[in-house]
């Protein structure tokens, strides 16, 4: 009943497709699909306000609101530290459990960690979109992620990379619903080149956060 109330509240009046039956984690669910038409921002590039997002490790995301000339209008640090602490605690328990049991028995605990990671991604994506909408940003800009093929590495590293990917996907969906475009740029030379396209910057040797261009 709660799910149907949510659909009536959030998706009333939207074009609905026939529900699909799905099996997930040995349970069956109904998936409802809706179609919504929105108009994305058409503001001229020179007049645009953008929300630049840096997805980090210690801090979940740093959002910078800026104009085309590089003027910073606002900055927000998004960090769900308690959620990450719980997730990493679960990973620690998985490592200890794995030493004593088979990998098949560990799978259910690993699935739980992935669900926690996805829930964290949803929270971060919602905060990014909300902040961009507050400043009426026309575009949310992310770093382009090279994530083709199988991801290797430790479980903590895998979860972090998956979280970056999921945040971008979720944020793109939420941003489009708010009429905000999403762009991805290569991170190469972003610290070396000036934001106005004039070329390389000159860094202060004593404080690398200060530069001249």
Task: Describe the residue ranges of each PLM region.
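Charged, flexible boundary elements
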Residues: 1-48
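Positively charged, helix-rich recognition surfaces that bind polyanionic ligands
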Residues: 28-213
């Amino acid at each position: 009943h709660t799910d149907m109330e949510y659909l009536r509240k959030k998706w009333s009046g939207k074009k609905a497709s026939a529900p699909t039956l799905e099996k997930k984690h040995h349970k069956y669910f109904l998936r409802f699909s809706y179609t919504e038409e929105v108009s994305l921002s058409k503001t001229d590039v020179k007049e645009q306000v953008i929300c630049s997002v840096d997805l980090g490790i210690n801090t979940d995301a740093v959002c910078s609101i800026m104009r085309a000339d590089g003027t910073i209008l606002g900055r927000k640090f998004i960090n769900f530290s308690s959620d990450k602490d719980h997730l990493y605690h679960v990973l620690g328990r998985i490592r200890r459990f794995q030493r004593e049991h088979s990998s098949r028995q560990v799978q259910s605990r690993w699935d739980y960690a992935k669900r926690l990671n996805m829930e964290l991604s949803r929270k971060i994506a919602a905060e990014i979109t909300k902040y961009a909408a507050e400043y009426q940003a026309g575009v949310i800009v992310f770093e382009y992620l090279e994530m083709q093929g199988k991801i290797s590495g430790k479980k903590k590293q895998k979860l972090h990379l998956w979280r970056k990917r999921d945040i971008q996907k979720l944020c793109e969906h939420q941003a489009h619903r708010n009429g905000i475009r999403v762009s991805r740029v290569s991170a190469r030379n972003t610290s070396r080149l000036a934001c106005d396209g004039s070329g390389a910057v000159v860094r202060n040797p004593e404080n690398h956060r200060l530069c001249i261009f």
